[in-house]
């Protein structure tokens, strides 16, 4: 099974990029198994390295469904990162962030 995570942006960087002081991101990973958690942790590490002032939250799909974080925070789906296309997907996500002015 190929694991993936979905990346969302929320907060001022996505509501009003000119007033933003940080970039709030949410990583939603598929489950609580080791491989899913490791992929989410690696994504968080790489995103934190490449995005200045990033604040990154991680939730499993079940946790996100329980808390309704995406809806409550009015989070914007930015893309997905698949473990077998990690670098390509990370580059695509970076492009999306640049286009939105969140970088």
Stretches with model-predicted labels:
Residues 1-10, 14-20, 29-103:
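Catalytic core of pol beta-like nucleotidyltransferases
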Residues 25-27:
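Short beta-strand->loop micro-motif that forms the acidic, two-metal-ion catalytic signature
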């Amino acid at each position: 099974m190929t694991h993936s995570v979905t990346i969302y942006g929320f907060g001022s960087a996505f509501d009003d990029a000119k007033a933003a002081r940080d970039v709030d991101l949410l990583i939603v990973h598929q489950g609580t198994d080791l491989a899913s958690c490791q992929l989410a942790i690696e994504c968080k590490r790489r995103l934190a390295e490449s995005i200045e002032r990033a604040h990154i939250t991680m939730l499993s799909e079940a946790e996100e469904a329980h808390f309704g974080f995406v809806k409550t925070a009015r989070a914007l789906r930015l893309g997905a990162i698949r473990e077998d296309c990690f670098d390509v997907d990370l580059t695509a996500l970076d492009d999306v962030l640049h286009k939105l002015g969140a970088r």
